[in-house]
Structure formats: C-alpha cells, structure tokens
Amino acid sequence: MASNWDILLIQAARQGNLARVQALLSQGANVNATDGQNTTALIYAVQGGHREIVAILREFGADINKSKQPQGLSPLMLAAALNHSEILAQLIAAGANVNQVNQDGTPALMIATYKGYTAIAEQLLTAGARVNMRDRDGDTALSVAISQNYAAIVGLLLDSGVDEEIRQEAWLEALNANRPEILQLFINRGMPLDAPTLSGETPLILAVERGNLGSVQTLLQAGANPNISTEEGETALMLAAAEGYFDIVRLLLAQGASVDNQNQAGETALHLGTIEGHLEIVQALLQAGAFVNHRNHFGDTPLLIATVQGYEAIVLELLKQGAEPNLTQQGETPLTLALQRQFTKICRYLLDYGANPNAVYPDGKTVLMKACEGNNSQLVRWLIDIGADVNKLDFSGASPLMWASYHGCLDTVKVLLDGGKVNLNQKNQGGMTALMLAKFNHHQAIVSLLQQAGAIE
C-alpha cells in the first residue's frame, strides 16, 4: 500500500511540480508506488510531457517498464501514443523495452503507427522495434498503417525488414482498401503486378471486382496486363462491364484491353454489359469496336439478350450499331421474343431496323398471328404497314383474322379489315372461317363487323 509520501509524489508528478517531486524523493517516497488507478509517478510524468520529472524519476530508480494495469500500458507506449519524442528518447536511452506489449498484444510501434506518428515509428525502429510483431488479432504495424492510409509509415515499414508473408498480406489489404499511393510503394519495391495475391486473384482482377478505380489506374500505369483473366476466363473488362463500372471500362479500353475476349461460356464484355442493362458501357464497348453479333455458347447475341430483358435503349443502340435483327436462337428471333413479352416499343425498333415481319414461331404461327391473338392492334398495324402477310396460314390452316376473331380481339379485327387485303372467307383445316369462329365463341361485335365487310359462312 502506498504511504502518504508516495501519494504526494504521484500527485506532484501528475501536476508537473518538479521541486516537489525532488523533495519527496529525497525524503524517501517510493518511486515505483502506484495510486488507486494503478498508475505510477513515471506514467503520470510521461502523460503530462514533463521531461525533467521523467529524468529525475529515472535517477531515483523508477522502473521504466512498469505498466499500468489492467491495460498493460507502459511508459514507452504512452510516450509513443502521445507523440512525446523527447521523452521516448529518454526512455529508450534508459533501456526501456521497445517490444513490450499491452494486454491486447500491441507494442509501441503499432500504437505509433495507428496514430500516424512517422517520426515516433522511426525512433522505435531505430531502437530495435520488431516490425513483424502481431497483436492478438493478428494485426501488424504494416496492416495498421494501411488501414489508416499512412503512406509514409508504410514506406518506412517496408524498408525495415518486413517478412514476405506479412508483405503479401499487406499487399492484399492495400488492394482491398483501394490505397493507390500505398500500392505504388509496393510496386516501387518490386511487387509482381500479375502474380496471384493470397486471395488467388491477380491484383488487377481484385481491384476491378471492388470497383477501385484509383487502384486500377495505378496498376495499369505500372504495366499490369489489361487482358489478364480469372480461371473462368473472365477478363478485367468483362468484370467491369458486368458490374457497371463505366470509368474502369473506359480506362481498360484506353490501356489496350481486348474488347472481344470470351469467357468459358463464350460471353464477351458486350454480352455481360448487356445482361446487366448498362447502357453507357454497351455504348463504350461498341465505340471500341465490339462485335455486335457475337454468339455465346448458348447461341445468344447481345440483341437477343437485351430483347428478352426488355432493355429498350440498349436494343436501339445495338441495332444502330449493326445488330442483325433476324438471327435465330432455338427458332426464336428477337422480334418473336419481344412480342411474347409484349415489349411493343422493342418490336417497333426491330421492325424499323429490318426485322422480318413474317417471322414464324416454332409452332407455325407468324408474328402477325401472335400480335392478333394478343389484341396488340398497334403492332398489327405496324406489321401490316411494312409488309406482313395478312393471309399467311399456320400449320392448322388458320389466318391472322381467324385468330383475332376466335379470341374476340375486336380492335385487331378492325385493323385487319381496314387493310383491305384480308381473305374474309378463308377456311382452316377444320373448315371454319373467321366468321364461324367468332360466332362459335359468341363474339357478336366481331360477327357484325365481319358480316358488314362481306364475310359469309
């Protein structure tokens, strides 16, 4: 237990009262006594930045490694944390343990690093601080410096004997954290640009996946291969296109990334940008010369994909850049797919750019028939205007008029009749006319309309 003299000594050190400290020490106060906070006079003197008091306490035998419990904070750690470089030098000169750790396993070097005190870190390293120490969480001074983005300290640590495992861990952390300036420090010290990181991915792929533009730029400027790919054949450009990282796409293209490389599924960056609906990226890839009609291993072109997804603006852009509107996939064309999904505007774009208005579905029905069945009178009119055959028959011998009449599509029947070329009395293989089908299904308005136009049974 501390005596009254001891308590007075601790108080004097805390207050920075040099004369009082000297007097109490001369009277026999215990230099290593602690108060109710488990704190010594030396720790209070360090905390207050009282250099002269630190010096006199040392002369009277203060234990320079005695730490405050339960935190385990030593005078040296406290000096580092408070950026007291002169006191730190005093303690080091007196033989303080520069590698002593607190209850978390943290040494003074990591504390100084966390605070961003480059000069303090350098003092500690010069005094023998071990650069490769880990705390209880496995962190090192280098990982702390990267997490805090202290480039100057990172450079200092890299030049102080960091072992290869820690260097590789830190490289990966800098990539994940998007630290371009710090990445450059590694690169300047010979870190391979295209070798896999500890994650198994190459630096450029990793940076692109995370959308870290600054890191991507640093890597490319340093000479990273812009066409490097994953095991699945995904290039950096494909990944950026799929994720919608427009600026990264532009940067990769400017640095020579191949626009038509394919992954294991035969997809290009244009396929992937289209799938995700990234119009600006699709435009950038097309401007860079991407092959607009490339098929993946499933037979899909970007136009087929955009059509199925209902991406109107992308469909139009692809068509403007030469996408073929009549390429088929399992018997389907972009137009048949658009009509199935009732994407009327896309149907119009496709027709305007040369889609076959007489395209036939696998079931034998024409696009016009499908439009009639769905009572899409606007599309029916467009199809007729550009030459769709209004009298073409399907496998059952049914015409567009029959299908419209059968389903009760009054508006569509009107459009067909307005065209003036419809065979009113055509019979299907069952011997039924459009009029008979309308009567059978009790569509009286259509029956009247057909009869007025001259239809007979």
Which positions does each model-derived feature cover?
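N-terminal segments that cap or nucleate solenoid repeat domains
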Residues: 1-40, 44, 181-195
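Solenoidal tandem-repeat scaffolds enriched in leucines and small polar residues
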Residues: 127-153, 159-164, 168-177, 201, ...
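Start-of-repeat signature of ankyrin repeats
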Residues: 5, 38, 71-72, 105, ...
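Ankyrin repeat structural motif
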Residues: 17-25, 50-58, 84-92, 117-125, ...
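Ankyrin repeat A-helix N-terminal signature
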Residues: 11-16, 44-50, 78-84, 111-117, ...
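Ankyrin repeat boundary/linker residues
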Residues: 35, 68-69, 102, 135, ...
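Ankyrin-repeat-protein effector appendages
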Residues: 1-11, 155-177, 181-192, 198-199, ...
